[in-house]
Swiss-Prot record:
Gene: IGKV1D-43
Protein name: Immunoglobulin kappa variable 1D-43
InterPro entries: Ig-like_dom (IPR007110), Ig-like_dom_sf (IPR036179), Ig-like_fold (IPR013783), Ig_sub (IPR003599), Ig_V-set (IPR013106), IgV_Light_Chain (IPR050150)
Compartment(s): Secreted; Cell membrane
GO-annotated biological processes: adaptive immune response; immune response
Length: 117
């Protein structure tokens, strides 16, 4: 099983914006949410076609570079707290934060790396 970590390069930022020209379209929901410390939070991401679990989740805080949190749909990047988990296969993927902490308030992005533009 190939569990490649996605390349972290500027070009991949194109995949995070609506209207980017690529073969696979990613849709994330909800666009925004209100949550409190201790809440269980779930974010869902759908691919327009199967991506064989080549799905990464990133966390970004204001004025900071995005950080890879999860790769290959469910593999936690080193140093990421265990309250974060990823799941899914085929076209449907989920990021879950089991108990939201103050440092978790941020923007989260999904990104497929099954194919590139």
């Amino acid at each position: 099983m190939d569990m490649r970590v996605p390349a972290q390069r500027l070009g991949l930022l194109l995949l995070w914006f609506p209207g980017a020209r690529c073969a696979i379209r990613m849709t994330q929901s909800p666009f925004s949410l209100s949550a409190s410390v201790g809440d269980r939070v779930t974010i869902t991401c759908w691919a327009s076609q199967g991506i064989s679990s080549y799905l990464a989740w990133y966390q970004q805080k204001p004025a900071k570079a995005p950080k890879l949190f999860i790769y290959y749909a469910s593999s936690l990047q080193s140093g990421v707290p265990s309250r974060f988990s990823g799941s899914g296969s085929g076209t449907d993927y989920t990021l879950t934060i089991s108990s939201l902490q103050p440092e978790d308030f941020a923007t989260y992005y999904c990104q497929q790396y099954y194919s590139t533009p």
